[in-house]
Curated annotation (Swiss-Prot):
The keyword DNA-binding does not apply. The gene is SEC63. This is Translocation protein SEC63 homolog. The lineage of its organism: Eukaryota, Metazoa, Chordata, Craniata, Vertebrata. Mediates cotranslational and post-translational transport of certain precursor polypeptides across endoplasmic reticulum (ER). Proposed to play an auxiliary role in recognition of precursors with short and apolar signal peptides. May cooperate with SEC62 and HSPA5/BiP to facilitate targeting of small presecretory proteins into the SEC61 channel-forming translocon complex, triggering channel opening for polypeptide translocation to the ER lumen. Required for efficient PKD1/Polycystin-1 biogenesis and trafficking to the plasma membrane of the primary cilia. It comes from Homo sapiens (Human). One of its GO terms (molecular function) is protein transmembrane transporter activity.
Length: 760
C-alpha cells in the first residue's frame, strides 16, 4: 500500500490557490453590496417628481444635501484594487507548474497513443542518439526516455504503469498544504502564536461583545427595549389616552435621550429657547411629576412636536433637533400600536377584572397622531391644509363658500372643473395647476371584502367558535385616475340619445366620494290624491218580477241539465281514453323532468366543487406567495409639506365593533400596497349565534381625511353537533368481524379434517 506524506508549501505554488480563493470570496460579494449606485438615476427620479413634490421639505433637503463624492470614489478605488489583486493571483496560478502530472510514456517519446512496437523502437533510437550522456546529451532526459521505453516494451513495467500509473510500481502519495513553510518554522513559532492569540482571544471577543451589547438594547424593529417598557407602563396606566396624553408618552422615548442615543443632542441654548417656545404654545402639563415624561429631553421633544403640529417657526438651532425627532415618530408610533394590541390580547386571555385593556380610542388616536406628525397639522384642522398654497386665510373662502361647502379633499375632487376653478379663484394659474397636480397624486383606495371559514366543508357558514377569515382586497388608484374615469362617464351620459329620449342626462352616476344629493322634500300640498273610481251598482227589480224570472230560469236550467247528462253519458268513453293517454304522457314528462332536475343538481354540485377547489388552490398559492415573496416596502412617496424625510404610503387595516368600542382583529400594517394587495384578517367568531355588525377600517399613517370605512355583516349559526357514528370509526369493528370469520372458517376446516380421519 502506498505511503502518505504531508509537506508544507516551500515554493508557494499551493498557497496561491488558497490566497486566490480567499480574495475572490471577499471581492465578489463586496462589489455587489458596496459598489456605489448610479447617482444619475436618483437625480432623474427627483427631476420627474419635481412638479408634484417640489415644495415638500424632504425634497428640498434632498437637493440641498451635499453629494458625498469622496466616499463613492474611495469605495471604487478599494474595490478596483481588490479586483486587480484577484486577477494577478489568478494569472499567477495559471502560470505555475502543476504539482501532480499523470505519467504518460507516449508523451515523453513524442508519440501518439497506440503506436506500434516498431515505431516505439525507432523513436527510442533517435532520442537516445540525441540525449545520450556520452554524446553530450541531457542525462535526466535520457533517463526519462529509457523509463518510457521500458514502460512500453517490458511487460512488467507496462503492467505497473497501467495499474499504478508509474512503471516502477506504487509510489508514496504527497499532499501539499496551502501554507508557506515559514509559518510552521520553529524560529517563527512564538510570533505566529502571538498573532493567533491576538486575533482570536482579543480582537474577536471585543468585536462580538461590542456588537452583542449594542444590539441587545434594540428590538427587531430597531426600537430601544427601554422605550417599549416605558410605553407599556404608561399605556397600561392610562387606559383611555387622549391626544395630549399620547404626545406626552410619545416624547418620553429613550431615542430622544442623549444617555441612550448618541445621535440625540442637548445644547446649553436649550435652556433659553425651550421656555420661549413653551410660552408661545401654552399649557403643556408641567405640574405632573411622572419621570421620564418630565425629564429635560422629554420636555424638549414634546415642545418640538407641538410646535411642528402648530406649524410654528422655531430658531435655526432647534430645526435640526426637530427634524431628528420627527424622523423617529412613525416608527415609535408603530411600536405604540403594537404595545396597545399586546395589552388588548393579554386582557382577553386573563379573567382578572383589574387588568383592563386599552380602549379603541387610544389605538385610533395613535394612528391619527401619525398622520398629524407627517402632515404637520393639529387634530381638528381641515385636511385641505395638506395642499400647497392653501393657508388659514384662504381656507375660509373654500370651506365657508355660499354655494360649495368643501370640508374634505373628496369634496374638492368631486366638483366640476369649472366649479373648482371658480372656488379657487384666489390662486394664480400656476398655483392652481400645482394644487391640481398634488390633488391628483393623492391615493384613493377601494376595499373588496369577503368573509369565510377556511378549512371547512361549508366555508360560507360561520358557526359559534369558528375562526373567521376576512379576505380584503385593496386596490389603490390616484384621485386623478378615478376622476378622469368619472368625467368620461358623465360626458358619455350627457350626449343626447339617438332614440330622442332627452331625459337620460338626469340620472347621472356619481363617484364613491361624492355626497348624495337630497331631492326636494314633498309637502302635503304637493301630494295630489287620485279620484277613486266608483263601481257600477246593480239595478234592483221588483219582487214579483224577480220571482218570475227565477222560475223561468229554473225551467230552462232543468232542460239544459237533461241535455248535459245525455252528452256526459255519450262522452264518458272518449274521456276515459283521453285520461289514460294524458296519464301516460304526464308520467313520461315527470320522468323527463326528474332526469333534468337530477342533471341540473349534479351540474350545480360539480360547479360548487370546482369553485371550492379553485378557492382552495388560490388560498394555498396566496400562502406560498406570502412565505416566499419578499415585497419591497417602497410604494409611493407621501406629499408632506413639513416632514423632513421621504416617507412611503403605508396603511393600517383592522376590524372593530363601533357599537361596543372593541377591537375585533389586530391591525395589519400594510407596507406593500402599490397597486393591489390581498390581506387576510382572522378572528374568532362570537360565542352566541345571531347577526353582528362590524366595521372594516383602513387608515393611512400619512394622510389626514383619506381613511376608508366599510361595514361587515356576520350571521353566526349554532355549531354543528359532533357526529357519534362515522364510517371511518367502524374500521376496527370490521377488522374484528373479519378476524372472527377467518377463525370460524379455520374451525370448520379442522372439523372436516377430523371427520375424514374418523371415516378412514
Amino acid at each position: 500500500m502506498a505511503g502518505q506524506q504531508f509537506q508544507y508549501d516551500d515554493s508557494g505554488n499551493t498557497f496561491f490557490y488558497f490566497l486566490t480563493s480567499f480574495v475572490g470570496l471577499i471581492v465578489i460579494p463586496a462589489t455587489y453590496y458596496l459598489w456605489p449606485r448610479d447617482q444619475n438615476a436618483e437625480q432623474i427620479r427627483l427631476k420627474n417628481i419635481r412638479k408634484v413634490y417640489g415644495r415638500c421639505m424632504w425634497y428640498r433637503l434632498r437637493l440641498l444635501k451635499p453629494q458625498p463624492n469622496i466616499i463613492p470614489t474611495v469605495k471604487k478605488i478599494v474595490l478596483l484594487a481588490g479586483w486587480a489583486l484577484f486577477l494577478f493571483l489568478a494569472y499567477k496560478v495559471s502560470k505555475t507548474d502543476r504539482e501532480y502530472q499523470e505519467y504518460n510514456p507516449y508523451e515523453v517519446l513524442n508519440l501518439d497513443p497506440g503506436a506500434t512496437v516498431a515505431e516505439i523502437k525507432k523513436q527510442y533510437r533517435l532520442l537516445s542518439l540525441k540525449y545520450h550522456p556520452d554524446k553530450g546529451g541531457d542525462e535526466v532526459m535520457f533517463m526519462r526516455i529509457a523509463k518510457a521505453y521500458a514502460a512500453l516494451t517490458d511487460e512488467e513495467s507496462r503492467k505497473n504503469w497501467e495499474e499504478f500509473g508509474n512503471p516502477d510500481g506504487p509510489q508514496a502519495t504527497s499532499f501539499g498544504i496551502a501554507l508557506p513553510a515559514w509559518i510552521v518554522d520553529q524560529k517563527n513559532s512564538i510570533l505566529v502564536l502571538l498573532v493567533y492569540g491576538l486575533a482570536f482571544m482579543v480582537i474577536l471577543p471585543v468585536v462580538v461583545g461590542s456588537w452583542w451589547y449594542r444590539s441587545i438594547r434594540y428590538s427587531g424593529d430597531q426600537i430601544l427595549i427601554r422605550t417599549t417598557q416605558i410605553y407599556t407602563y404608561f399605556v397600561y396606566k392610562t387606559r383611555n389616552m387622549d391626544m395630549k396624553r399620547l404626545i406626552m408618552v410619545l416624547a418620553g422615548a429613550s431615542e430622544f435621550d442623549p444617555q441612550y442615543n448618541k445621535d440625540a443632542t442637548s445644547r446649553p441654548t436649550d435652556n433659553i429657547l425651550i421656555p420661549q417656545l413653551i410660552r408661545e404654545i401654552g399649557s403643556i402639563n408641567l405640574k405632573k411629576n411622572e419621570p421620564p415624561l418630565t425629564c429635560p429631553y422629554s420636555l424638549k421633544a414634546r415642545v418640538l412636536l407641538l410646535s411642528h403640529l402648530a406649524r410654528m417657526k422655531i430658531p435655526e438651532t432647534l430645526e435640526e433637533d426637530q427634524q431628528f425627532m420627527l424622523k423617529k415618530c412613525p416608527a415609535l408610533l408603530q411600536e405604540m400600536v403594537n404595545v396597545i394590541c399586546q395589552l388588548i390580547v393579554m386582557a382577553r386571555n386573563r379573567e382578572e377584572r383589574e387588568f383592563r385593556a386599552p380602549t379603541l380610542a387610544s389605538l385610533e388616536n395613535c394612528m391619527k397622531l401619525s398622520q398629524m406628525a407627517v402632515q404637520g397639522l393639529q387634530q381638528f384642522k381641515s385636511p385641505l391644509l395638506q395642499l400647497p398654497h392653501i393657508e388659514e386665510d384662504n381656507l375660509r373662502r373654500v370651506s365657508n363658500h355660499k354655494k360649495y361647502k368643501i370640508k374634505t379633499i373628496q369634496d374638492l375632487v368631486s366638483l366640476k372643473e369649472s366649479d373648482r376653478h371658480t372656488l379657487l379663484h384666489f390662486l394664480e394659474d400656476e398655483k392652481y395647476e400645482e394644487v391640481m397636480a398634488v390633488l391628483g397624486s393623492f391615493p384613493y383606495v377601494t376595499m373588496d371584502i369577503k368573509s369565510q371559514v377556511l378549512d371547512d366543508e361549508d366555508s360560507n357558514n360561520i358557526t359559534v367558535g369558528s375562526l373567521v377569515t376576512v379576505l380584503v382586497k385593496l386596490t389603490r388608484q390616484t384621485m386623478a385616475e378615478v376622476f378622469e374615469k368619472e368625467q368620461s362617464i358623465c360626458a358619455a351620459e350627457e350626449q343626447p340619445a339617438e332614440d330622442g329620449q332627452g331625459e337620460t342626462n338626469k340620472n347621472r352616476t356619481k363617484g364613491g366620494w361624492q355626497q348624495k344629493s337630497k331631492g326636494p322634500k314633498k309637502t302635503a300640498k304637493s301630494k295630489k290624491k287620485k279620484p277613486l273610481k266608483k263601481k257600477p251598482t246593480p239595478v234592483l227589480l221588483p219582487q214579483s218580477k224577480q220571482q218570475k224570472q227565477k222560475q223561468a230560469n229554473g225551467v230552462v236550467g232543468n232542460e239544459a241539465a237533461v241535455k248535459e247528462d245525455e252528452e256526459e253519458v255519450s262522452d264518458k268513453g272518449s274521456d276515459s281514453e283521453e285520461e289514460e293517454t294524458n296519464r301516460d304522457s304526464q308520467s313520461e314528462k315527470d320522468d323527463g323532468s326528474d332526469r333534468d332536475s337530477d342533471r341540473e343538481q349534479d351540474e350545480k354540485q360539480n360547479k360548487d366543487d370546482e369553485a371550492e377547489w379553485q378557492e382552495l388552490q388560490q388560498s394555498i398559492q396566496r400562502k406560498e406567495r406570502a412565505l416566499l415573496e419578499t415585497k419591497s416596502k417602497i410604494t409611493h412617496p407621501v406629499y408632506s409639506l413639513y416632514f423632513p424625510e421621504e416617507k412611503q404610503e403605508w396603511w393600517w387595516l383592522y376590524i372593530a365593533d363601533r357599537k361596543e368600542q372593541t377591537l375585533i382583529s389586530m391591525p395589519y400594517h400594510v407596507c406593500t400596497l402599490k397597486d393591489t394587495e390581498e390581506v387576510e384578517l382572522k378572528f374568532p367568531a362570537p360565542g352566541k349565534p345571531g347577526n353582528y355588525q362590524y366595521t372594516v377600517f383602513l387608515r393611512s399613517d400619512s394622510y389626514m381625511g383619506l381613511d376608508q370605512i366599510k361595514p361587515l355583516k356576520l350571521e353566526v349559526h349554532e355549531a354543528k353537533p359532533v357526529p357519534e357514528n362515522h364510517p371511518q370509526w367502524d374500521t376496527a369493528i370490521e377488522g374484528d368481524e373479519d378476524q372472527e370469520d377467518s377463525e370460524g372458517f379455520e374451525d370448520s376446516f379442522e372439523e372436516e379434517e377430523e371427520e375424514e380421519e374418523d371415516d378412514d
